[in-house]
Swiss-Prot record:
Family, as annotated: Belongs to the anti-CBASS protein Acb1 family.
Protein's name according to its UniProt entry: Anti-CBASS protein Acb1
InterPro entries on file: Acb1-like_C, Cyclic_Pdiesterase
Keyword Hydrolase applies: yes
GO biological process per UniProt: symbiont-mediated suppression of host innate immune response
Superkingdom assignment: Viruses
Catalytic activity: 3',3'-cUAMP + H2O = U[3'-5']pAp[3'] + H(+); 3',3',3'-c-tri-AMP + H2O = A[3'-5']pA[3'-5']pAp[3'] + H(+); 3',3',3'-cAAG + H2O = G[3'-5']pA[3'-5']pAp[3'] + H(+); 3',3',3'-cAAG + H2O = A[3'-5']pG[3'-5']pAp[3'] + H(+)
Keyword field contains Hydrolase: yes
Source organism per UniProt: Erwinia phage FBB1
Pfam families the UniProt entry points to: Acb1
Binding positions for 3',3'-cUAMP per the UniProt entry: Y12, F74, Y108, E142, W148
């Protein structure tokens, strides 16, 4: 049972992927010749980024949560241009909605499931849709780190 003081620390939940998905993502990074590719062990999708800690139960299991994605450029908090693979995933959207129903906060107007491929692509531009079978390996949760930076 959590102590009341632990609920003020915030919550971060992310999805990690199967080895075959990680292989496909690394191949995509290589084929695009991405500068500053996110390392294999850091590839993930954020599900919850909440300044409020809620009693979220992480899920496990291995199943496909998306079969393709489109390349999108996001501006990061540090002002860099990140390249992400944005996905339509009913599963990830439902898990995010579950957290919101529990009272989780979210700093952005919409939840857009994605996997960051590079946190800094500079002035380069990328576009297109790519077939990448995204298979969930597990979810994990930890205390929200408001000091995290994509510069790390």
């Amino acid at each position: 049972m959590k102590k009341l003081s632990e609920f003020g620390k915030g919550l971060y939940v992310a999805a990690k992927f199967s080895e075959s998905t990680l292989d496909a993502l690394e191949e995509l990074q290589r084929s695009l010749k991405l500068p500053n590719p996110v390392p294999r062990d850091k590839l993930h999708t954020t599900i919850v980024y909440s300044r409020v800690n809620v009693p979220y139960k992480v899920a496990s299991g291995s199943f496909e949560i998306a079969d393709k994605g489109k390349l999108t450029v996001f501006e990061t908090q540090s002002g860099n241009r990140a390249l992400v693979l944005e996905m339509d995933s009913d599963y990830l959207s439902a898990r995010h909605s579950y957290a919101k129903a529990l009272g989780a906060s979210y700093d952005y107007p919409d939840y857009r499931p994605h996997i960051t491929l590079s946190y800094n692509i500079g002035v380069l531009n990328f576009s297109g849709e790519y077939k990448v079978p995204v298979v969930l390996d597990r979810e994990y949760s930890e205390e929200l780190d408001l000091e995290w930076s994509d510069k790390d």
